């Protein structure tokens, strides 16, 4: 009979902070996308994509990390914690949807900057509203005091 170098009770696998953080983020992001699909400022085409689940949390990385002034693809990928290739795929999809465009950067004709289009800026505004709505709902679910402590703790833990 083998002996375990740890407690064989496996309940710890689904009862730790990382597990709860992942589930909370999934719920929060899903609610944000739901709010965006219904937002009156989101262009109809993007609203339909969001409502049909075609816009994923991965696409939100562009919304979350692309500065309003634009950024090089490598900088955007780094900010989102993704590879340049994975971010390039997302940018291609968002470009096809009219959310972003690639434009020349200074004197280097090879360098490109990813920037929001007018549609993308409308999407960004809806994202801001949706995040605020999801946060308000979260505060309602757990209470203001818990939400505040949670926000402060996560900010401290993440090094922010």
Please place each PLM-identified region on the residue numbering.
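Charged, amphipathic alpha-helical coiled-coil/dimerization segments
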Residues: 92-151
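Positions in alpha-helical segments
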Residues: 15, 19, 61, 136-137
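Non-catalytic interaction surface on structured domains
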Residues: 17, 28, 32, 80, ...
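N-terminal leader segment of winged-helix/HTH proteins
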Residues: 1-54
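Carboxylate-rich helix-loop segments that flank metal/cofactor sites and access channels
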Residues: 58, 90-93
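Alpha-helical linker/hinge and terminal dimerization helices associated
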Residues: 21-24, 28-36, 80, 120-142, ...
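N-terminal helix-turn-helix DNA-binding core of bacterial DNA-binding proteins
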Residues: 32-83, 159
């Amino acid at each position: 009979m083998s002996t375990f170098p740890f407690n064989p009770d496996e309940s710890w696998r689904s009862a730790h902070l990382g597990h709860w953080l992942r589930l909370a983020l999934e719920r929060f992001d899903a609610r944000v996308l739901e709010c965006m699909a219904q937002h009156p400022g989101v262009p109809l085409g993007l609203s339909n994509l969001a409502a049909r689940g075609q816009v994923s949390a991965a696409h939100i990385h562009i919304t979350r990390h692309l500065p309003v002034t634009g950024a090089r693809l490598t900088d955007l990928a780094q900010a989102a914690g993704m590879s340049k290739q994975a971010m390039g795929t997302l940018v291609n999809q968002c470009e096809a949807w009219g959310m972003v465009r690639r434009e020349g950067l200074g004197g280097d004709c090879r360098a490109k900057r990813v920037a929001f289009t007018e549609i993308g800026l409308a999407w960004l505004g809806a994202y801001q509203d949706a995040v605020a709505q999801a946060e308000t709902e979260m505060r309602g679910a757990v209470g203001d005091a818990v939400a505040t402590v949670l926000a402060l703790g996560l900010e401290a833990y993440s090094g922010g």
